Amino acid sequence: MQKPAVNIMVKAARSAGNVLLRHINKLETLHVIQKSRMDYASDVDEMAEKVIVKELKRAYPEYGILGEEGGLQGNHRIMWVIDPLDGTSNYLRGFPHYCISIALVENGEPTDAVIFDPLRNELFTASRGAGAILNERKIRVANRKDLNGTMLNTGFSPRERSRAHAQLKCVDALLMQAEDIRRSGSAALDLAYVACGRADAYFEAGIKVWDVAAGMLLVREAGGYVCDFKGADAPRMDDKGPESCQLVAGNIKVAHALQQVIVSSGYGREFDPKR
């Protein structure tokens, strides 16, 4: 039985999903803002976030909000961390891979998570200590023992393009062991896919906390492990934590092996968490 907070999160995510689907055939009418060279937002991002915030605030008016479009509002000790459209570039091009991500964070740690893919009607949920679920089915991370034959997910952050050479060097080293590496354009779905075993691990630098807050909990509750590029604990999700971070996720053996390649290739040294 889901917690009341998760039920509200699911309702909010599904409402936002309806907003995304209603506009998918009229993308040319959307107003698009270029936040940086490779980072975009649109009317539909804002509309979806407003729908989510309205649902959450109605049920829990005392909780704070950290959203991609609206920033931090209110109480940061207990807050919702929202990405109303993770994979905006995909969405705006009609590429069918994007989602809504919502996490409830208490004292810097995610306690509940929802990731919803409206196109596939796939609903990922997790609560701390209660496991991870995909459409009412318990999920687990893959059980590989090392990097050999793994399917890895990554992203090329628009905020870290100057370090692309280091990431490509890391990718080159990983391809000597992994079966393949995917770059899907949605960090939240990348983590959800690690949680359900569709991918073996995920790594990325310069990723925003709202992109990964829900996915981190999903991976942990699916029996996985999450750390930064140095092998330390993943960052806090509050005003004391960084706005962007570096992340490695998978089962503990694969995550550690991946983190070691990141360090040995020099990619970890290239990342500056203060950027």
UniProtKB/Swiss-Prot annotation:
GO cellular component: cytoplasm
Main location as per UniProt: cytoplasm
Annotated Gene3D superfamilies: 3.40.190.80, Fructose-1,6-Bisphosphatase, subunit A, domain 1 (3.30.540.10)
Cofactor annotation: Mg(2+)
Keyword check for Glycosyltransferase: no
Catalytic activity, reaction form: a myo-inositol phosphate + H2O = myo-inositol + phosphate
Positions that bind substrate: E68, L85, D86, G87, T88, R182, D211
UniProt GO MF annotations: inositol monophosphate 1-phosphatase activity; metal ion binding; RNA binding
Keywords, in A-Z order: Chaperone, Cytoplasm, Hydrolase, Magnesium, Metal-binding, Ribosome biogenesis, RNA-binding, Transcription, Transcription antitermination, Transcription regulation
Subunit structure: Homodimer. The rRNA transcription and antitermination complex (rrnTAC) consists of RNA polymerase (RNAP), NusA, NusB, NusE (rpsJ), NusG, SubB, ribosomal protein S4, DNA and precursor rRNA; S4 is more flexible than other subunits.
Function: Part of the processive rRNA transcription and antitermination complex (rrnTAC). The complex forms an RNA-chaperone ring around the RNA exit tunnel of RNA polymerase (RNAP). It supports rapid transcription and antitermination of rRNA operons, cotranscriptional rRNA folding, and annealing of distal rRNA regions to allow correct ribosome biogenesis. This subunit may play a central role in organizing the structure.
The protein's name in its UniProt record: Nus factor SuhB
This protein's encoding gene: suhB
